[in-house]
């Protein structure tokens, strides 16, 4: 939802559209689109910087301001919609040689006795869908433009989101899934001086 505040990268402040917890909160609350549904979300390393640097939980603050944005947890959460089990995980570390590798390895660690139908993993700023080990798996894209930092690291942001239509039987088994990737226009790199 936000890029966070990286005190260990002094140039980071010059790459932001707005600066500080309050401005970031206002930006999300005012700019995140409104639509008829709810957005369930978790945090991650970017949003965790507010907690590390000042003890503030950006996810909780966003949910207090927008009742359609439901914050579940800082890093990992399980959600049930009807009988469909959804597992969200932010992820961590660097990118791998192939787009699916980190997601595949993570899915292999999930408990097999738990009903998880859909796995959604973030962090890597790439988008992809695959069916693996009986689970519909999504590598979700980024909600931010490419930054000078990501460019210097050789990371290409895929600014996007998935819209997912599913059909389930009475037991909650998915028999049809249609993921649609919406790609957003990226803006020009920002570096303020």
Residue ranges of model-derived segments:
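Core catalytic region of metal-dependent phosphoesterases/phosphodiesterases
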Residues: 1-71
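Short glycine/proline-enriched coil/turn segments at helix->beta-strand junctions
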Residues: 33-38, 84, 133-134
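Residues that act as N-cap/strand-start positions at coil-to-secondary-structure junctions
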Residues: 71-75, 158
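Short acidic-hydrophobic surface loop/beta-edge motif
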Residues: 75-82, 130-132
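Conserved beta-sheet core of the metallophosphoesterase superfamily
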Residues: 85-87, 92-179
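Short, solvent-exposed aromatic-acidic interface loops
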Residues: 176-189
């Amino acid at each position: 939802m936000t890029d966070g505040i990286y005190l260990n990268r002094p140039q980071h402040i010059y790459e932001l559209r707005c600066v500080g917890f309050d401005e970031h909160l206002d930006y999300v609350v005012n700019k995140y689109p409104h639509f008829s549904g709810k957005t369930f979300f978790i945090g991650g390393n970017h949003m965790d910087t507010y907690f590390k640097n000042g003890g503030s939980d950006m996810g909780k603050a966003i949910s207090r301001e927008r009742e359609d944005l439901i914050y579940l947890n800082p890093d990992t959460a399980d959600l049930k919609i009807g009988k469909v089990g959804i597992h969200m995980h932010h992820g961590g570390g660097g990118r791998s040689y192939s787009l699916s590798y980190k997601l595949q390895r993570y899915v292999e660690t999930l408990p097999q006795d738990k009903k998880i139908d859909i796995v959604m993993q973030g962090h890597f700023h790439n988008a992809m869908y695959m069916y693996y080990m009986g689970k519909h798996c999504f590598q979700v894209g980024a909600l931010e433009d490419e930054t000078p930092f990501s460019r210097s690291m050789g990371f290409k942001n895929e600014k996007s989101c998935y819209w997912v239509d599913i059909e389930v039987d009475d037991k909650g088994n998915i028999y049809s899934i249609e993921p649609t990737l919406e790609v957003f226009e990226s803006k020009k790199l920002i570096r303020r001086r």
